[in-house]
Amino acid sequence: MCWRPSLTKGFYVKSYYKVLSSPGGGLFPWKSIWKVKFPPRVAFFSWTAALGKILTADNLRRRGLILVSWCCPCKADGESMDHLLLHCAYAKELWDMIFVWFGISWVMPRRVLELFDCWQWNMGCHQKLVVWRVIPHCIMWCLWRERNARTFEGCELNIVELKLQFYRYLFDWRSATGLFSFSNLLDLIDYCSI
């Protein structure tokens, strides 16, 4: 959930109550998913995740499949979509890396849909904003691919390798748009740092 000020009054309890009492918490944040420039299959994955439809263990159990429900990356009990992509200790390492990189404090929302709704924060600088908007998609894509590699191929990246994979995807996706003149990954990291 993201509580935004009204245009005239700022933050008021009444506006917060309206956000809390509205069913679904508001409109679907489709611009956070479909208006950001990155590979279409990643956009489809993000859209599916925002709708709560990716095939994690809890969703497969709801469909009648009997399987062990544990999170591959953190080896904890109960693989849900929100746990895997937001709250898993393995995912937390990636999210914390981003928040330190951009020099911000952040409280992770409960659900993926709420994250996309809150992620529309304005960074001020256009190039930083373009990078900022693709980050949740990139992190979730890395985590999903790692989960699938562990589940179906028996391969496992350590957290440092996963962080490097994240940066590689981020740099490649941003370079493919032609919006940036960064010659290497270190230039991108340095530019977005606080």
Label each PLM-derived region with a short phrase:
Residues 1-194:
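Charged boundary/loop elements
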